[in-house]
Amino acid sequence: ILKFALSEKNIVTATKYLKVLPVIKKLIVYLNIPAPSEERGAALWHKDDFGYKSLDLFLAVSDININSGPLYYLKAKKELGVFLKIKNIIKNALPGERNKVTLESFSNYFDKDKIGALIGKSGTGVFIDSFTTYHRGGYCKSENRIMLRISYQTPDTKRGQQPYNQQEFAYYPKIKKKDIKNIFHRYILFKDRNKFLQFIKIDKIILSFIKIFHYKL
């Protein structure tokens, strides 16, 4: 998985989109199982509020159909990007539902033909910007879903800034910084903000700026 995440094609794709050499802030394989309840949490419409720009690869490990919790995403490109927000979010939200939008509310803003779905055989994938694109997924009706997610981001984002051993790769501690000889791979896996940017809490400054200029539908 790590070799695939560091593949030249993926890194070049992320670099072209982000305009800088990316860092990997999320590398995870999801296993979702059928749920008796209605959609909640990440199965509701949302954006990931961690920064200004991201490029996330979602890749089907198992075959995915309508019954196994496909990823849904807004295909329509919005010029306002991260600044666009739907104001009709869930009130008195339960844990995991903060800033989420119900399926019913979302349908009042965007037609079905504006929504894409990651459905297909194992190996089918899609790149989306999870910071600027509304998306949801993981609600399995009757079948399991296994999906790989890789988030390529810039070092100034909030995601991945929690304390951890910086000499080990957070998602697979057997990967040691000292063992990575390729300087680009070392940057991608272990790069953190410099101490000055950490001191001024640049991620909070960026997020506050974005919230000030939100355009709410």
Residue ranges and their predicted role:
Residues 1-23, 117-121, 195-217:
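N-terminal auxiliary "cap/dimerization" subdomain that precedes the catalytic jelly-roll/cupin core
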Residues 9-80:
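Conserved double-stranded beta-helix
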Residues 37, 66-67, 81-82, 135-137, ...:
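Short catalytic/ligand-binding loop motif for oxyanion handling, primarily in non-cytosolic enzymes
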Residues 41-48, 118-119, 136-140:
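Short histidine-centered beta-strand/loop micro-motifs
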Residues 41-45, 100-111, 163-167:
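Short, surface-exposed loop/helix-turn segments at secondary-structure junctions
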Residues 44, 56-60, 115-117, 125-127, ...:
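Conserved hydrophobic/aromatic beta-strand scaffold that supports enzyme active sites
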Residues 67-133:
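Double-stranded beta-helix
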Residues 87-88, 125, 131-217:
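Non-heme Fe(II)/2-oxoglutarate
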